[in-house]
Amino acid sequence: MGKRLISQNRGRGTPKYRSPSHKRKGAVKYRSYDEMEKDGKILGTVVDILHDPGRSAPVAKVRFANDEERLVLIPEGIQVGEEIECGISAEIKPGNVLPLGEIPEGIPVYNIETIPGDGGKLVRSGGCYAHVVSHDVGKTIVKLPSGFSKVLNPACRATVGVVAGGGRKEKPFVKAGKKHHSLSAKAIAWPKVRGVAMNAVDHPYGGGRHQHLGKPSSVSRHTSPGRKVGHIASRRTGRK
């Protein structure tokens, strides 16, 4: 009997592969899309800036004028004590939240909603931003960091500016232990060992006097879980 593959262990859901969500500061999303934001604006004050484990960007605790508190992603240049505005009549300034339809073309935005009121789904990593490309009747086109242009409802909210925490990838990890701790906060198993580098007991591609597959890489979709590695139910393999 061989040992279980990493995909089988992950499916079992042991602590190694389970996201440590109990360490999170809380949900990071916009306040509910109420009449106060639809008709005007509401002011909020940044009372604290926090580090959220497993998140690449810092988060801010914002207290609004109605004493409601929220965790939000902050842009570069915001500090404790500054005020932000949320609503259709908010000023075009980094940190302010407006519907996409009210943001001029060419302005960088982040934490974009895909459905009005969902709290923000797109462009949330540190240092990321998207651009408002154009407006049309009933739609706004936004260019995402990947280069893909997405058509969205103009009522979807977004934050003006660039997410704080940019440049994080420029500093090397240097030590393997630092990378291990960084990725363990996101429940990512690291390092990732190749199957051909394993022993025969650990992987179907393991063993042998040199590193090679030793068998076809294509497998049936209905094969047993312990053998389901490589190109699963592939129509074709190799270069085109």
From Swiss-Prot:
Keywords in UniProt for this one?
Answer: Ribonucleoprotein, Ribosomal protein, RNA-binding, rRNA-binding
Q: Where is the composition biased (Polar residues)?
A: 1-11
Q: Which gene encodes it?
A: rpl2
Family, according to the entry, reads as follows: Belongs to the universal ribosomal protein uL2 family.
Q: How does it assemble?
A: Part of the 50S ribosomal subunit. Forms a bridge to the 30S subunit in the 70S ribosome.
> Where is composition skewed (Basic residues) in this entry?
13-28, 224-240
Q: What does this protein do?
A: One of the primary rRNA binding proteins. Required for association of the 30S and 50S subunits to form the 70S ribosome, for tRNA binding and peptide bond formation. It has been suggested to have peptidyltransferase activity; this is somewhat controversial. Makes several contacts with the 16S rRNA in the 70S ribosome.
Mind telling me what this protein is named? Large ribosomal subunit protein uL2
Quote the HAMAP family the UniProt record gives. Ribosomal_uL2_A
Among PROSITE patterns, the record links this protein to: RIBOSOMAL_L2
